[in-house]
Every structure is written in C-alpha cells, then in structure tokens.
Design a protein with these regions (language model features):
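Short, low-complexity N-terminal intrinsically disordered segments enriched in polar/charged residues
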Residues: 1-57, 61-66
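Short beta-strand edge/turn micro-motifs at domain boundaries
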Residues: 2-4, 113-115, 125-126, 130-161
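A solvent-exposed, acidic/Ser-Thr-rich amphipathic alpha-helical stretch
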Residues: 41-108
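Short, well-ordered beta-strand segments in beta-rich or mixed alpha/beta enzyme
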Residues: 49-53, 113-120
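Short Pro/Gly-enriched beta-strand edge/turn motifs at strand-loop
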Residues: 84-87, 118-122
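Generic structural detector for well-ordered beta-strands
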Residues: 106, 121, 139-141
C-alpha cells in the first residue's frame, strides 16, 4: 500500500524529489495554516498564469482565472481561510495526504510538467463529505537554482472524460 507521506522519488532523483516536496507536503502544510509565506518562494512571478478547468473536460469551458500570481495568491488565501473555519471529524492533514497523488513528473531540460491528482475527500463533523476529486497540471521551471511553479491548469476532472 502506498504511504502518502513518503516521497516516491529517491533523493538521488534530486529534481523530482524537490518538486514533490514543494507540491505535496509544503503546499498542504501551507494551506492548512493559511500561510502563504511558506510557499511564496515556490513561484516564478513574472509570466505566471493559472487556468481554472472548472472540473470540465472541454477546454472551451476553462477560464483564465489567475492572470497574475497576486490573483492566485488572493484566491488561495481566501480558500485556505475558509477551509480553516470548517469542522472535520478526521485529521485533515492525513486525509489530504491520502487523497493526493503525485507520481508523474516529466522533465525536459529546465522545464517540468507535473501531474497532481486528488481522489477522495474529508468527512465533516456533521457527517457530510467534502469531495476532493480533480487534478492539476503544474508547469515548473528551474529558476534561480531551484524548481518553481510558473503556471498551472487546475481543477480538471479526475479522471478526464
């Protein structure tokens, strides 16, 4: 059985290992504490772009929701703060790690295409489920000596079609 807390990439695969650390534990921990400062250096601000797939298969329905990093940061903080007000009957960190899979990273030179998938959910205190079932394609670049996010197409259906 997969250990959701264990980086699937050995430290000898430095690029993939670092990308996983950035997009799984650091991202989850920052979100759960609504602390943007934990991830702010994980982005390339110049030219950043974020597409909201709206959980739709057709690209005709996708939207340029985040034309700047600041636009994404503001929405990320809004979502993180809203999440913090909710009550869950299980450990949220464990549930999010269990729901998250990131095992496919394609690297060409100083660019990477990263596939992060969510398949599961969290049980709320009232017994309802907060379903997490989407995927995100991250576009990463080796920038200033480390891997950073330069854009993404997120909230895509999982599975597609």
């Amino acid at each position: 059985m997969r250990d959701p807390f264990k980086n699937p990439f050995p430290s000898s695969d430095a690029a993939r290992h670092a990308i996983w650390e950035m997009l799984v534990p650091r991202d989850i921990d920052a979100f759960l504490t609504a602390d943007w400062s934990m991830v702010q250096d994980d982005f390339v601000e110049e030219g950043f772009i974020g597409i909201d797939g709206r959980k739709e298969v057709s690209p005709d329905k996708w939207r340029l929701a985040f034309p700047t990093l600041n636009a994404y940061r503001d929405e990320w903080l809004r979502q993180a703060k809203d999440f913090a007000t909710q009550s869950f009957s299980e450990d949220t960190r464990t549930a999010i790690f269990t729901t998250t899979t990131l095992e496919d990273i394609e690297i060409e030179g100083d660019m990477a295409l990263v596939r992060k998938k969510f398949d599961g959910g969290l049980t709320k205190s009232d017994g309802t489920r907060d379903i997490m079932q989407w995927q995100t394609l991250y576009y990463c670049r080796l920038h200033e000596g480390r891997w950073k996010i330069c854009g993404f197409t997120g909230y895509l259906p999982n599975p597609m079609g």
